[in-house]
């Protein structure tokens, strides 16, 4: 599928509450997904997953991924359930205040006008969380889009978004509903009565009012979402919900006049997540723990000043993010009842300031930025009680911690003529541990992972160089990069069941005990490239990502030295074709291939290489209405997503075929 280059940095017209693209962004590795790119996907994470090296923690989309594994990472350096990428909607972070993951069902592709993906640590205006890059979503500011479809596996989907103008007011509204009966992840002889469907029901609604004022454009936005899903095991389910409110005031820079932005937001979320232990023959499950509630609240403020004077553009800004949350859980299931209760949580905050700018002279663009951030982890606690008597069994109050991080970026781009550009860039970034990583232990089947309140922020250093050429009939570009993550947060294996451990308690046969730890460093070298060519009515596209990431566990985790990070493939590639078969008929297809992954930190559980073919046929029945038939994993390939300690593999969705109607105005 073709991707656009980032929007022209000279664009200054603002029809939504966001500053125009900064000139500095052209010096870094960026991909833009247009509205037409998004129209082919049912879910936002599937749309961004078209870019090689961009993926959720596992090889599953949000159709079947547990909320706690919907974190997204770029470049396959070290995928994480919490995600190592900052995801924003017009500047407001979408990352969950408790876990750092993103509940992708809160937004439908129809509600967006485009997505900008910037790979490499996001210093400058982005700050904490943008360790491997930034995914910037842009909400629709014109037109109407609606989509209705049905398919096998009980798939039903309806989504609509519209913008209307009345005087100096602009109104935006969006709603979506997505339902699936799901599929059973475990297949073949290994499947037992314990294995059930990953059913899904998700809904969201959002609205926005933009108003022109004497100070600038004022935007008020609110949104709500909820999803309920099965985890593929009898008795294991998850329910995630939340809402967000934001206020933004923007004055776009015009000519040499000063532009600025002020933004405030508040996000709340909650998560129910139940886990089970699986019998050795997979004939049954037993309740293991019930994470009944995870109430969390995130607040944020940011502001920026920007001005362009000739070839110089500068921006000064500051931002603050505060998260407060806890988990309430029942666990230790014995004799038909949970015997222990646990409440754990705390607060995190990051406050930072930055200076960012660029200088354009002739064929040269020089861009750079510097940030200073102060992070804090405070008021942490973990209290465990006897469920029957209320007696306190454990009361931990880890000491408050804080620190400062300086990060920056520098990039140089030169126009070589004949539509060819070369660039080089360096950057640093950091990501503090989420409340989930600090305080919440979790269980998947028979595998238990313990929390760690002493986790330090992850830090990344990187260098990259690239060259690109774009013409009327196509483009080609390539980037080579080196990244190092210091103190990466890794799920480190401590032992295997059956057995009882000082932390984690009893681990059954076929399970392992892990703990989140800062494990040395991860070094990654890689190459990413893409090409596109238009031949008459046919557009051919391809993309490649090769990332060799290796762990050096040092003295803390020497058993990891030389291993690849869990869920990090070396190779991934896509090939796409889009053809206008007639004035009304269009065919699009994408072939995706990925090399093997490892399920675990010790690289003992191998996930085989995987490929899938997707295709879609569109027929324009009216000027504004399109009927389509689409197939995901059209050849029904077996795509491994997980593997247990006793060798049982889980798989991604089988073939899904759907038919639908789309309205676009």
Give the predicted meaning of each segment:
Residues 45-92, 96:
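Extracytoplasmic beta-strand/coil segments of soluble accessory domains associated
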Residues 180-186, 196-202, 215-260, 268-296, ...:
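Flexible loop and strand-edge segments within Gram-negative outer membrane beta-barrel domains
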Residues 198, 290, 294, 298-304, ...:
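Outer membrane beta-barrel strand-and-loop segments of large Gram-negative receptors
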Residues 268-272, 324-333, 376-392, 400, ...:
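Surface-exposed extracellular loop regions of Gram-negative outer-membrane beta-barrel proteins
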Residues 360-366, 374, 475-476, 481-485, ...:
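Gram-negative outer-membrane beta-barrel transporters
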């Amino acid at each position: 599928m073709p991707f656009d280059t980032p929007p022209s940095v000279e664009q200054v017209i603002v029809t939504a509450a966001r500053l125009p693209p900064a000139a500095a962004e052209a010096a870094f590795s960026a991909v833009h997904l247009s509205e037409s790119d998004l129209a082919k996907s049912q879910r936002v994470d599937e749309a961004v997953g078209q870019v090689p090296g961009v993926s959720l923690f596992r090889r599953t989309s949000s159709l079947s991924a547990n909320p706690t594994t919907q974190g997204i990472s770029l470049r396959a350096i070290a995928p994480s359930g919490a995600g190592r990428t900052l995801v924003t909607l017009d500047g407001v972070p979408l990352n969950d205040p408790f876990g750092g993951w993103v509940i992708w069902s809160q937004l439908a592709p129809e509600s967006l006008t485009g997505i900008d993906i910037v790979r490499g640590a996001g210093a400058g205006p982005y700050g904490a969380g943008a360790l491997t890059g930034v995914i910037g979503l842009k909400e629709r500011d014109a037109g109407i889009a609606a989509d209705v479809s049905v398919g096998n596996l009980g798939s039903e989907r309806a989504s609509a978004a519209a913008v209307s103008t009345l005087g100096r007011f602009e109104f935006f509204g969006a709603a979506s509903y997505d339902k699936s009966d799901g599929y059973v992840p475990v297949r073949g002889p290994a499947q037992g009565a314990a294995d059930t469907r990953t059913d899904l029901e998700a809904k969201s609604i959002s609205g926005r009012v933009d108003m022109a004022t004497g100070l600038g454009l004022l935007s008020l936005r609110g949104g709500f979402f909820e999803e309920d899903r099965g985890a593929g095991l009898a008795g294991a389910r998850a329910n995630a919900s939340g809402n967000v409110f934001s206020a933004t005031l923007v004055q776009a820079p015009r000519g040499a006049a000063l532009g600025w932005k002020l933004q405030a937001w508040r996000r709340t979320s909650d998560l129910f997540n139940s886990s089970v232990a699986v019998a050795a023959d997979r004939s049954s499950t037993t309740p293991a723990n019930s994470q009944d509630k995870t109430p969390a609240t995130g607040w944020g403020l940011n502001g920026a000043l920007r001005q362009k004077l000739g070839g110089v553009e500068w921006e000064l800004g500051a931002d603050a993010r505060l998260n407060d949350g806890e988990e309430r859980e029942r666990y230790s299931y014995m004799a038909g009842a949970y015997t222990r209760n646990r409440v754990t949580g705390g607060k995190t905050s990051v406050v930072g300031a930055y200076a960012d700018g660029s200088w354009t002279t002739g064929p040269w663009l020089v861009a750079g930025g510097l940030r200073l951030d102060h992070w804090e982890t405070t008021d942490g606690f973990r209290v465990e009680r006897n469920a029957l008597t209320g007696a306190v069994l454990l009361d931990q109050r880890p000491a408050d911690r804080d620190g400062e991080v300086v990060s920056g970026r520098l990039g140089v781009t030169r126009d070589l003529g004949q539509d060819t550009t070369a660039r080089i860039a360096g950057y640093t970034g950091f990501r503090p541990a989420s409340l989930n990583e600090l305080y919440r232990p979790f269980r998947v089947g028979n595998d238990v992972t313990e929390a760690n309140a002493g986790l330090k922020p992850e830090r990344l250093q990187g260098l990259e160089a690239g060259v690109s050429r774009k013409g009327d009939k196509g483009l080609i570009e390539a980037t080579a990069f080196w990244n190092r993550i210091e103190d990466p947060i890794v799920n480190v294996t401590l032992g295997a069941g059956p057995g009882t451990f000082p932390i984690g308690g009893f681990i059954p046969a076929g399970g392992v005990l892990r703990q989140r730890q800062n494990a040395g460093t991860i070094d990654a070298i890689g190459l990413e490239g893409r090409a596109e060519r238009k031949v008459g009515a046919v557009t051919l596209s391809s993309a490649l990502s090769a990332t060799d990431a290796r762990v050096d566990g040092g003295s803390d985790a020497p058993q990891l030295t030389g291993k690849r990070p869990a869920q990090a493939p070396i190779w991934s590639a896509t090939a796409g074709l889009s053809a206008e078969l007639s004035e009304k008929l269009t065919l699009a297809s994408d072939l995706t291939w990925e090399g093997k992954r490892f399920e675990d930190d010790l690289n003992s559980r191998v996930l085989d290489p995987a490929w899938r073919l997707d295709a879609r046929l569109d027929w324009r029945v009216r000027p504004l209405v399109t009927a389509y038939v689409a197939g995901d994993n059209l050849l029904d390939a077996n795509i491994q997503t997980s593997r247990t300690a006793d060798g049982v593999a889980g798989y991604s969705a089988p073939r899904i075929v759907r038919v639908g109607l789309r309205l676009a105005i």
